[in-house]
């Protein structure tokens, strides 16, 4: 059971995010739309991960486990794709990278087909649930591609002296994965991908344009304008009174 503890925590985080994000109006832009897709995909990702674990525990049917593992890895590639899209959408205001987005989409489709149709060797021993084979390698390769993309984008933004605030969660994701692989060398049964994505999406929630904050700023600005206009009116009345008295 300890193998999916992180997945369960990840599920609690993503459910909380879904409630927070969809329970109030959001700014209608590409950033929030992409973020909505990310949290939706991550919810499915975690659910499939937990379901796969229980199917393994209850049935030990390697063929059925393999099918769910392939679905799990396919959703991971979509998470990677929309994460790369997110980085481009946030910074590509002039839409200069349309061709790059198409290339990333095509690579992802090919990766998903490879995951679904290439052989996968299911590893299930005790609490350990893993896989090897060409299908697994394709999923790992696509994840490495996305991480390389995040690093390149970060370097580009630093060189151009742009803010990297919105891409920091993905740098944290890379660090978490590296730490996760080290920890997994000692606790091989741990499944951490869903938890890590839930965690960085929680961080991202605080970097996207918050409609409540935006509204509060607009109200404060309107209040300041009204106060300034009121002061000018009072000053004008005082000046008129002084002129009448003189």
Annotate the PLM regions.
Residues 3, 158-221:
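Interfacial "cap-and-anchor" motif at the non-cytosolic start of specific transmembrane alpha-helices
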Residues 61-72, 127-139, 192-197:
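Non-cytosolic membrane-interface motifs at loop->transmembrane helix junctions
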Residues 223-246:
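PAS/LOV and related PAS-like sensory modules
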Residues 84-95:
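Class A GPCR helix-loop hinge within the 7TM core
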Residues 4-86, 103-121, 170-185:
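Hydrophobic alpha-helical transmembrane segments of multi-pass membrane proteins
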Residues 16-22, 82-86, 143-164:
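Alpha-helical transmembrane segments in multipass membrane proteins, preferentially the mid-helix core
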Residues 34, 99-100, 131-139, 154-175:
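Membrane-helix boundary/juxtamembrane motif in polytopic membrane proteins
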Residues 1-12, 107-156, 180-186, 190:
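Extracellular-loop-to-transmembrane junctions of the mid-late helices
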């Amino acid at each position: 059971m300890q193998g999916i503890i992180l997945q369960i925590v990840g599920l609690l985080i993503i459910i909380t995010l879904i409630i927070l994000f969809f329970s109030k109006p959001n700014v209608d832009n590409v950033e929030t739309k992409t973020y909505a897709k990310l949290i939706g995909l991550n919810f499915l990702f975690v659910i499939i991960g937990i379901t796969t674990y229980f199917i393994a525990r209850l049935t030990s049917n390697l063929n059925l486990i393999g099918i769910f593992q392939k679905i799990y890895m396919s959703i991971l590639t979509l998470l990677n794709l929309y994460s790369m899209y997110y980085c481009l959408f946030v910074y590509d205001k002039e839409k200069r990278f349309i061709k790059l987005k198409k290339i990333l989409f095509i690579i992802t489709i090919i990766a998903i087909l490879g995951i679904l149709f290439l052989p996968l060797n299911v590893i299930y021993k005790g609490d350990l649930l893993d896989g090897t084979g060409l299908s697994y390698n394709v999923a790992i390769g696509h994840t490495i591609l996305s991480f390389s993309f995040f690093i390149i984008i970060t370097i580009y933004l630093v060189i151009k002296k742009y803010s990297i605030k919105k891409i920091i969660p993905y740098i944290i994701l890379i660090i978490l994965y590296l730490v996760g692989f080290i920890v997994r060398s000692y606790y091989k049964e741990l499944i951490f991908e869903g938890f890590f994505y839930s965690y960085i999406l929680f961080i991202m929630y605080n970097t996207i344009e918050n409609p409540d904050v935006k509204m509060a700023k607009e109200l404060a600005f309107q209040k300041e304008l009204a106060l300034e206009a009121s002061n000018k009116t009072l000053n004008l009345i005082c000046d008129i009174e002084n002129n009448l008295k003189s």
